Amino acid sequence: MAQLLGDAEIQSQASKLSGWTLEGSKLQTTRKFKDFIEAIAFVNKLVEPAESAGHHPDIEISYNKVKVTLTTHDAGGLTQKDFDVAATISQIN
């Protein structure tokens, strides 16, 4: 099981991620697109990096908005995997 990060490390890691917020024991970002088709195209781009990392975000789609939430469920909070996947997602347009 992945090691939970302490509060200081979580704050430090989160400060390096533009567009992400801490929501309790979760890391979230919301992206807005021109339309539903672009939103779904973005979601499809998340598949390969999530599979490669073996760490899958929770994804909510609302027409042209996509909310991506990361947490390590089996660890009960945030781990390095969450921040690594968030950094990868941040690079996806």
UniProtKB/Swiss-Prot annotation:
Catalytic activity field: (4aS,6R)-4a-hydroxy-L-erythro-5,6,7,8-tetrahydrobiopterin = (6R)-L-erythro-6,7-dihydrobiopterin + H2O
Alphabetized UniProt keyword annotations: Lyase
InterPro entries to which the protein is assigned, alphabetical: PCD_sf (IPR036428), Pterin_deHydtase (IPR001533)
Keyword Chloroplast listed: no
Entry's Gene Ontology BP terms: tetrahydrobiopterin biosynthetic process
EC number(s) recorded for this UniProt protein: 4.2.1.96
One Gene Ontology term of the molecular function aspect: 4-alpha-hydroxytetrahydrobiopterin dehydratase activity
Pfam families per the UniProt record, alphabetical: Pterin_4a (PF01329)
Similarity remark: Belongs to the pterin-4-alpha-carbinolamine dehydratase family.
PANTHER family: PTERIN-4-ALPHA-CARBINOLAMINE DEHYDRATASE
Name of protein: Putative pterin-4-alpha-carbinolamine dehydratase
